[in-house]
Curated annotation (Swiss-Prot):
The record marks R35, K42, H290, T386 as: Transition state stabilizer. It comes from the Bacteria. It comes from Clavibacter michiganensis subsp. michiganensis (strain NCPPB 382). HAMAP family: IspD (MF_00108), IspDF (MF_01520), IspF (MF_00107). The record marks R177, K230 as: Positions MEP for the nucleophilic attack. This is Bifunctional enzyme IspD/IspF. GO terms for biological process: isopentenyl diphosphate biosynthetic process, methylerythritol 4-phosphate pathway; terpenoid biosynthetic process. It catalyses: 2-C-methyl-D-erythritol 4-phosphate + CTP + H(+) = 4-CDP-2-C-methyl-D-erythritol + diphosphate; 4-CDP-2-C-methyl-D-erythritol 2-phosphate = 2-C-methyl-D-erythritol 2,4-cyclic diphosphate + CMP. 4-CDP-2-C-methyl-D-erythritol 2-phosphate binds at D264, V265, H266, H290, S291, D312, I313, G314, T385, T386, T387, D388, F392, R395.
C-alpha cells in the first residue's frame, strides 16, 4: 500500500509566514531498531505499555510554548505512527504533522525540516528513542538557542575511562575525559542557519550538531539529563522499563513477568509445500495439517497463550474454522499476539528450538527471526537440532518445535 509522504494535519512550509508558532520540533522516529531486535521500528516499541514515540511526543506537547511538531516516520509504518500521534496529540493534533523519513537519519531530519511552517525560527531536533527526556530539557535548549544565537546541545560528562586503540585492539593511550561530554537530544538551532547547513551538507554526520559545525556554525553545550538516554539495545529498554515502573510505584518489572511453553509436531507430507518459521521452503517436503503445518509458529502461539493464561491454540482457533484452512503461521501469530496484548500483557521475547533433519535452518535463520519478530512485535530467536538422527524427527518422518515465551503484565 502506498501513502502520501505527508499526512495532512498542519500547513506545509510557507516561506514568508510570520503568524504562527516560532518553535518547531522535529521528532525523528524513522529508525528500524535493528540493534534492539524488536522486529518493528524502535519508536513503536512499548515501555510500560506506551510506545517510545508516545512518551517522546508527550514531553514535547507538554511545552508551555506553542510549537509546530513534525514526526518523521518510516514509510512502512506510516499508518501506525499516525495512530500514535492521533492518540497522544488529541486536541493539539492540528499542530502535529507526520512525514515519511529518508534512507538515513540525515535524510529524515531534512524531510522534517521541510515540513515545518514558515513562522518557525527556532528548531529542536529530537530522537524518539530518547523517550524519557523531560519537558524541561526541551524548554532549556530552546531558551539557550535564542540567548546564544547558536546551536545548543544537552550533554553529560563522560564518567568512564576512555582509551584510544588501533584496529588490532592495541591500546594507544588514555583520553583526557575532563573536556569530554556525551551529547543528547533535543539539539536546538536557529532555523535559518540549520536550513542553510542542511542545504550545504554533502557528507553524512552522526548528529545535527556535527553537521551544523561542519558548515561553520557555533555549538554550545548545556547540562543534559540522565533521563535523556537513548534506547538502542535490549539493556537500554530494560533500564527504561525499570525507571517507568519505579515512577509508577509498580515495583520491579520482574514481579510482573510470566513464562509459557509450547510444543507442536507435524508429520511430513511430501504432497504439500513446506512452510516453517514463517517462510516458504521451495523444494522441501511439506507438513500435514489443517493450516500450513508451520510447527514453529504453532509452538510459539501455544507458548504465548500459556504465558498469558489464555489456553492453547486448539482451544482458541480450533480446526473447524474454514477461514483458517490452509492459513499461514503468521496469521495465527498476529492473532495470538493481539489476544495476549488485549489480555493486558506485553510480549517480551520468544525462543524456539526446532527438531528436524530438514530443512537446514542456518542459512535462513536471520530471515525467519525477522519474519517471526515482526508477527508478534517482539524479539524472536530460533535454534535447530537434528536430534542426532534419533526418533521420528531423526528419521525425517516429522518436524517438532518447542517454544518458550516471556510476557509482562502491564
Amino acid at each position: 500500500m502506498s501513502h502520501d509522504p505527508v499526512v495532512p494535519s498542519a500547513p506545509a512550509t510557507d516561506g514568508g509566514a510570520t503568524d504562527g508558532p516560532r518553535l518547531g520540533v522535529v521528532v525523528v522516529a524513522a529508525g528500524s531498531g535493528t540493534r534492539l531486535g524488536a522486529g518493528i521500528p524502535k519508536a513503536l516499541v512499548e515501555v510500560g505499555g506506551v510506545t517510545l514515540l508516545a512518551r517522546s511526543l508527550s514531553s514535547v506537547l507538554g511545552l508551555a510554548e506553542e510549537a509546530h511538531v513534525v514526526v518523521v516516520a518510516p514509510d512502512t509504518h506510516l499508518a501506525e505512527t499516525s495512530a500514535v500521534v492521533d492518540a497522544v496529540a488529541g486536541a493539539a493534533r492540528g499542530s502535529v504533522a507526520v512525514v515519511v523519513g529518508g534512507a538515513t537519519r540525515q535524510g529524515s531530519v531534512r524531510a522534517g525540516l521541510a515540513a515545518l511552517v514558515g513562522s518557525v525560527d527556532t528548531v529542536l531536533v529530537h530522537d524518539a528513542a530518547r523517550a524519557l527526556t523531560p519537558t524541561d530539557l526541551f524548554a532549556a535548549v530552546a531558551r539557550a538557542v535564542r540567548a546564544e544565537g547558536a546551536g545548543v546541545v544537552p550533554g553529560l560528562p563522560v564518567t568512564d575511562t576512555v582509551k584510544r586503540v588501533d584496529p588490532a585492539g592495541e591500546c594507544l593511550g588514555t583520553v583526557d575525559r575532563s573536556d569530554l561530554v556525551g551529547v543528547q537530544t533535543p539539539q536546538g538551532f536557529p532555523r535559518a542557519a540549520l536550513d542553510a547547513a542542511y542545504a550545504r551538507a554533502a557528507a553524512e554526520h552522526t548528529d545535527d550538531a556535527a553537521l551544523f559545525q561542519a558548515s561553520g556554525g557555533r555549538v554550545r553545550v548545556i547540562p543534559g539529563d540522565a533521563l535523556a538516554f537513548k534506547v538502542t539495545t535490549a539493556w537500554d529498554l530494560r533500564r527504561a522499563e525499570e525507571l517507568v515502573a519505579r515512577d509508577a510505584g509498580a515495583g520491579s518489572a520482574s514481579s510482573r513477568l510470566r513464562s509459557g511453553i509450547g510444543t507442536d509436531v507435524h508429520a511430513v507430507d511430501a504432497s504439500q509445500p513446506l512452510w516453517l518459521a514463517g517462510l516458504h521452503w521451495p523444494g522441501e517436503a511439506g507438513l500435514a495439517g489443517h493450516s500450513d503445518g508451520d510447527a514453529v509458529s504453532h509452538a510459539m502461539c501455544d507458548a504465548l497463550l500459556s504465558a498469558a493464561g489464555l489456553g492453547d491454540i486448539g482451544g482458541i482457533f480450533g480446526t473447524d474454522d474454514p477461514e483458517l484452512d490452509g492459513a499461514h503461521g503468521e496469521v495465527f501469530l498476529r492473532r495470538t499476539a493481539e489476544l495476549v496484548r488485549d489480555a493486558g500483557y506485553r510480549i517480551v521475547n520468544v525462543a524456539v528450538q526446532v527438531m528436524a533433519v530438514r530443512p537446514k535452518l542456518s542459512p535462513r535463520r536471520a530471515e525467519a527471526e525477522r519474519i517471526l519478530s515482526a508477527a508478534v512485535g517482539a524479539p524472536v530467536s530460533l535454534a535447530g537440532t537434528t536430534t542426532d538422527g534419533l526418533g521420528f524427527t531423526g528419521r525425517g518422518d516429522g518436524v517438532a518445535a518447542v517454544a518458550t515465551a516471556l510476557v509482562e503484565r502491564l
